[in-house]
A protein has these predicted regions:
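Phosphate/diphosphate-binding glycine-rich loops and adjacent basic-rich segments that engage nucleotide
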Residues: 26-98
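Glycine-rich phosphate/pyrophosphate-binding loops
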Residues: 13-27, 125-143
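Structural motif
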Residues: 14-18, 43-44, 52-55, 81-83, ...
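Secondary-shell segments that build the walls of catalytic and ion/ligand-binding clefts
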Residues: 76-136
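Conserved active-site and cofactor/substrate-binding residues in soluble primary-metabolism enzymes
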Residues: 4, 40, 103, 114-125, ...
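N-terminal intrinsically disordered, cationic/polar leader segments
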Residues: 6-8
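Catalytic-core signal marking the mid-to-C-terminal active-site face
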Residues: 126, 137-179
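Short glycine/serine/threonine-rich phosphate/pyrophosphate-binding segments
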Residues: 1-3, 28
Length: 179
């Protein structure tokens, strides 16, 4: 959903970066742990390009809170095991998230590479809640996102044209990659 905010800035050849967390909610376990500590902590970045911009909007967890809630309400199973049960087993059943002891969502990268998603989740926590001075330590109630927005002007660095040359080159290499 954060990607919707990127387009006007990208159209102006700016690079927006948006990070957000909700300090009132904990749903994702840290790598190697079972307990819920932070939220999926999405980040979005817009990368201008002459042909087509790149809009990236990803969470630092394997799935989102919304996916767990909607799948649970529908009585279904997740597409893949993304829940860590309260007993430390992985599961595709959202019921395990709501069970006692409560389950948690695995960080991006799951069990094998979850340390990477966990590290990125911590980065989002630091740049949102910690920088704002209002976070999990304050035990907030209700919805209250901590957000960090950064807008980078390539003209202030190596220049807009050079930036677009590079982003177009990388995008073209990706699109031309063999399937």
């Amino acid at each position: 959903c954060l990607a919707a905010y990127l387009e006007p800035l990208v159209e102006a050849n700016l690079v927006p970066l948006i990070l957000t967390s909700d300090p009132a909610v904990a749903s994702v376990a840290p790598y190697g742990g079972l307990d819920r500590v932070y939220t999926p902590n999405p980040l979005a970045i817009g990368i201008p390009g002459r042909e087509q911009p790149m809009l990236i909007d990803v969470s630092m967890s394997t799935i989102t809170n919304g996916t767990v809630g909607k799948t649970h309400a529908a009585g279904g199973k997740l597409d893949h095991p993304a829940i860590l049960t309260g007993h430390g087993e992985i599961s595709d059943d959202p019921e395990d998230y709501f069970a006692s002891p409560e389950g948690s969502i695995l960080p991006l990268g799951e069990l094998a590479f979850g340390h990477k998603g966990f590290a990125l989740g911590l980065m989002v926590e630091a740049l949102t809640s910690a920088l704002s001075g209002f976070g999990r330590k304050d035990a907030p109630e209700g919805w209250g996102a901590s957000v960090m927005v950064m807008v980078i002007d390539p003209a202030r660095f190596g220049g807009t044209e050079s930036f677009l040359d590079e982003t177009d080159h990388v995008a073209r290499r990706c699109l031309d990659s063999r399937p």
